[in-house]
Amino acid sequence: GGAVPIVGAEIRILDPQGSSVYELTTDESGETERVSLETMDRSLSLDPDYSGTPYTGYDVLVRAAGFNSLYISGVPIYEDETAIQPAELLPMQQTQRSPMVNEITIEKPAAASDIRRIQEKPEPELRVLRQVVIPDPITVHLGSPSSSAANVQVRFTDYIKNVASSEIYPTWPDASLRANIYAIITFALNRVFTEWYRSRGYSFDITSSTAYDQAYVHGRTIFESISRIVDEIFNQYVRRQGQNAPYFTSFCNGTTATCSGLSQWGTVSLAERGLTPLQILRNYYPNNIEIAETNAVTGVLSSYPGTPLRTGSRGLDVQVIQTWLNRIRRNYPAIPEITDEAGVFGDSTRAAVTKFQSVFNLT
């Protein structure tokens, strides 16, 4: 079923020396208060020549009665950046005497590592979906394509936030973040559109392999600067003018690796020179690319909570619908604004749903 907030979970934050700096408890929403942590100077993460780690990594231990514990090592904290750490706890089995500890390790972003990229470009005549659709959820294989790793289903926006947080630094200038996020969204949509893996008999859309596709670390920290942009542009992608297909937006870090696609570090200096996200993208991809958007979503039914949403419903499923309706409102201003609290199905959400259903003849 859907996720339920865990009230009263204990969270301990440990500094790099292993000393406990905070002990927190989750509230009725399953969240803790925000806390401030010491870290490095922000400017270090804007310098491609800085060879150290431009952030301080903290460890987080999450415990709750009846659940297995979670230990996250290397949670990256940047100056003036809000880091959001999801924590999904798995219930203990009845046969278990004591909780196990599940571990997540967060490495430095791909832009700072020297992994060789071998992102393969699809041939134009591969199986292709006629319409550009957002796979929600997207199925991610947690390893290289032929490995026996697990597949996970992830909300598309959460997937993009995770990849961007795993690929680049959240401190980069806004235009640089946007250019990279457009490339990340488009790369994923290209894999789905060309059915790159599914046409080869695999049961997933994309892998978490930095070499073959783009970095994804299940359960990792995400950053508010990235999260905010993704919520705004997750249904926009790069294509050539006059073509529907998502362009093959390959990329690499541009320091230890160079490629024919976008240079992640290169976007920083271009943004600092005042270029817009589209100008930055045109610097690396053909000049006739444009940003398009799609309002087609597939797979929404598979994430259907099993009960109809109605006034008084609460939770992530409601929030998903509110996010979509607010996004669609930009193009369909007849849909009234949602003023309800996120995740709460109140009168304004009901009004927006009703109008959406009539606009799209769904009633």
Predicted regions mapped to residue ranges:
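Acidic/polar residues in short coil/turn loops that connect beta-strands
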Residues: G1, D27-S29, A342, T363
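Short amphipathic, basic-aromatic surface patches that mediate peripheral association
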Residues: G1-G2, L44
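Short, ordered, surface-exposed loop/turn motifs in non-cytosolic proteins
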Residues: G2-E28, V318
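Short, surface-exposed loop/turn motifs at beta-strand boundaries within globular domains
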Residues: V4-I6, Q17-S19, T53-Y55, Q131-V133, ...
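Conserved, single-site charged/polar hotspot
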Residues: G8-R12, V35-L37, L61-T363
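Short, acidic Ser/Thr/Gly-rich low-complexity loop/linker segments typical of extracellular
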Residues: S19-L46, Y332-A334
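Surface-exposed coil/turn segments at beta-strand junctions on protein surfaces, enriched
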Residues: T25-D27, S51-Y55, Y78-D80
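A short, solvent-exposed loop/turn motif at the edges and junctions
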Residues: R42-S73
